[in-house]
Amino acid sequence: KGAAHSLARLFDVAADPANRALMTFPSPKTGATVWRCYQVPKTVDDLALRRLMSARWAEETFGLMGRTPDHVAGFLAGYAAKPSVFAEHGKEFARNVLAYHEFARDHHLYLSYAIVPPQIDRSKPAHRQSDPTLYAGVVKETDAGIVLKGAQQLATGAAFCDAVFISCIHPMQPGDEAY
């Protein structure tokens, strides 16, 4: 209950017209007002405003609430700032990163992430586990998207967010491509 009220306060701060210049910016695609945490900084001023926006939300919770909506949004903004990293494995990966950043930004998504595999046998990479579906991984690709099977944890904020971004904090090894 307390976390839900704290998040509601953050959304209220972002929606308050008095905070518009700090907390939001116009979507490059639609011109609609969107959260600044999704902005890809192009200037020193953009970066400074992004920091001030995060500081404003941190002040609202006295710095005690982890994984506020700006956290994973910042990851997506970082990915969108450098899509060439994703293009190294295929142009479609860069396009997908940019499209998802745009979608999340323009729909004000509060995202959480799940980034740590279950605590099983950490001496083995994902593809060498006794059951290939212990770690979250792609088991099927369709025109509509991917089908995942398995688990991933450390999804702080998942109970409140719009979607969970599945990723992995551990370095991947050859053979782990599905994970």
Where are these regions (language model features)?
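Generic recognition of long tandem-repeat/solenoid scaffolds
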Residues: 146-149
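Short, surface-exposed, low-complexity cationic segments
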Residues: 2-16, 159-169
